[in-house]
Curated annotation (Swiss-Prot):
Compositionally biased intervals (Acidic residues): 34-50
EC identifiers of the protein: 2.3.1.48, 2.3.1.-
Name of one Pfam family that matches: Acetyltransf_1
Binding positions (acetyl-CoA): 254-256, 261-267, 293-296
Residue(s) at site: Important for catalytic activity: 250
UniProt keyword list: Activator, Acyltransferase, Bromodomain, Chromatin regulator, Nucleus, Transcription, Transcription regulation, Transferase
CC annotations in GO: histone acetyltransferase complex; nucleus
Compositionally skewed regions (Basic residues) per UniProt: 1-17
Reaction equation(s) it catalyzes: L-lysyl-[protein] + acetyl-CoA = N(6)-acetyl-L-lysyl-[protein] + CoA + H(+); (2E)-butenoyl-CoA + L-lysyl-[protein] = N(6)-(2E)-butenoyl-L-lysyl-[protein] + CoA + H(+)
Gene this protein is translated from: GCN5
Lineage: Eukaryota, Fungi, Dikarya, Ascomycota, Saccharomycotina
Official protein name in the record: Histone acetyltransferase GCN5
Organism for this UniProt entry: Kluyveromyces lactis (strain ATCC 8585 / CBS 2359 / DSM 70799 / NBRC 1267 / NRRL Y-1140 / WM37) (Yeast)
Length: 516
């Protein structure tokens, strides 16, 4: 085995979208034979015919019993995966030929209706809940849907509320796209959809081994939800593995084609998946490993780094990805996620109604007469201003309000830090160096620094001047170059990130002299 390189920063190389790059191969139970892989390197994927079928054998039947057999046995692993996107030594050197005399597994997805509109009963229930402990008048009046603009408006207590649908929602309503749940059931159309998903995952996750992606997408213990543009063009999807008895599912791959992004497909796809899973299974939680580029997406979809699910439930059952961040989503049982925009507006409307019942903040009073003559403005007692006393205002509040919450350079520092964190060369510097991985690092580097520590200091108002902020940024670059040799990738990453940082500082005239 080659010696480990010294490095600055925890983790391994990650890809830019979706999942992390480096895989620890899933290990099988003792009584389970090694499963065969499907070749993911073939380029002739669009001409899928009836002879493209996945294996079904006694090995598959044992694979399906994994959940009942117990956690993964770490002593029986027979495959090896190299780190950071290097070549993968798979279990078998030659892919098995696909058999055709197999028993067809019935798909569990046929009964799913991916409609994005609520029933009248659901709407009525939502209205009753939002109207609880208030008057019994209808919560929504004069609802108007503008299909051309993709907006919906309604009146509530005389106030107009509106929300705009994502382009993906509009396309679904117009019948241009659909969301299909598919698995490897030997049907020609489902195999074509799965192959389209495989191609997207392999393209969007370039550091992930192609044969590994193919094996999991075609694996019958996994399901996939695909975004399909009619007639049959796959533009993205999610592959996941359900553990019904343990009430959670593992999201294995999630990606949208690079040509179809920024249209809301990712968020709409996740909402469809949540509603489908809750409607067809006892699953209440999602778990997934996300790289640094995917964490933001998953946070927006309700995922968190705080894992509340008991380790005994999932440990040993999900695939472990080196360098990834484990995230969890707890699904709400009484929410239909496809209607989240309307539900949030209804909640806002109900809260505003409650506020109006106990406050006068909605009352608009006339302006002060003292300002009619701008040439002769006289001081006034604030307590004589109509409504101010009723709102609970005191002079002490004014003193607190006038204190600056942030330093004068905070906004510029925050923008610079965000730019640094999002740069492609920043991944080794996002977190402190792991002492267990690099034992002698803190003996050699006496003043360590990383981007997450800078973020904590910035949020704690510990940077009084821009010079202090730049000093810490320089610490990151100098520490890396001091510890790593010139020929290492980390040394080069530090140079790239420093050059980018200097260019960004120079774009701000009042600070440009600090990097000359």
């Amino acid at each position: 085995m080659p010696p480990k390189r010294r490095h600055h920063g925890a983790g391994r190389v990650q890809n830019k979208r979706g999942k992390v790059d480096t895989v620890k191969e899933e290990i099988k139970p003792k009584d389970e034979p090694v499963e065969t892989e499907i070749d993911g390197g073939s380029a002739v994927d669009e001409d899928v015919t009836d002879d493209l079928e996945h294996k079904t054998s006694k090995e598959d039947q044992k694979e399906d019993q994994k959940e009942e057999d117990g956690p993964i046995d770490a002593q029986n692993g027979t495959s090896e995966t190299k780190v950071a996107g290097e070549s993968v030594k798979t279990v078998e050197d030659k892919i098995e030929s696909v058999t055709t005399n197999e028993e067809v597994v019935e798909s569990p997805v046929n009964d799913y209706n991916a409609s994005s509109t609520t029933t009248k009963a659901e709407e009525k229930q939502l209205e009753e809940e939002a109207n609880e402990k208030t008057d019994t008048s209808p919560i929504v009046e004069n609802e108007v849907v503008d299909e051309e603009a993709g907006t919906t408006k309604f009146d509530f207590d005389g106030q107009e509320y509106s929300y705009k649908d994502r382009p993906s929602v509009i396309e679904e309503k117009e019948g241009k796209i659909e969301f299909r749940v598919v698995n490897n059931d030997n049907s020609k159309e489902n195999m074509m959809v799965l192959t389209g998903l495989k191609n997207i995952f392999q393209k969007q996750l370039p550091k992930m081994p192609k044969e590994y992606i193919a094996r999991l997408v075609y694996d019958r213990s996994h399901l996939s939800m695909a975004v399909v543009r009619k007639p049959l063009t796959v533009v993205g999807g999610i592959t996941y593995r359900p553990f019904d008895k343990r009430e959670f599912a593992e999201i294995v791959f999630c990606a949208i084609s690079s040509t179809e992004q920024v249209r809301g497909y990712g968020a709409h796809l996740m909402n469809h998946l949540k509603d489908y899973v809750r409607a067809t299974s006892p699953i209440k939680y999602f778990l997934t490993y996300a790289d640094n580029y995917a964490i933001g997406y998953f946070k927006k979809q309700g995922f968190t780094k705080e894992i509340t699910l008991d380790k005994n439930v999932w440990m040993g059952y999900i695939k472990d990805y080196e360098g990834g961040t484990l995230m969890q989503c707890s699904m709400l049982p009484r929410i239909r996620y496809l209607d989240a925009a309307k539900i949030l507006l209804l909640q806002e409307a109900a809260i505003r109604r409650k506020i109006r019942s106990i406050s006068q903040s909605h009352i608009v009073r006339p302006g002060l007469k003292q300002f009619l003559d701008l040439d002769n403005i006289k001081p006034i007692d604030p307590m004589t201003i109509p409504g101010l006393k009723e709102a609970g205002w005191t002079p002490e509040m004014d003193e607190l309000a006038q204190r600056p919450k942030r330093g004068p350079h905070y906004a510029a520092m925050q923008n610079l830090l965000t730019e640094l964190q999002n740069h492609a060369a920043a991944w080794p510097f996002l977190q402190p160096v792991n002492k267990e991985e690099v034992p002698d690092y803190y003996e050699f580097i006496k003043e360590p620094m990383d981007l997450s520590s800078m973020e904590m200091k910035l949020n704690g108002n510990r940077y009084e001047k821009m010079e202090n902020f730049i000093y810490d940024a320089r610490l990151i670059f100098n520490n890396c170059r001091a510890y790593n040799g010139e020929n290492t990738s980390y040394f080069k990453y530090a140079n790239r990130l420093e050059k980018f940082f200097n260019s960004k500082v120079k774009e701000i005239p009042e600070y440009s002299h600090l990097v000359d």
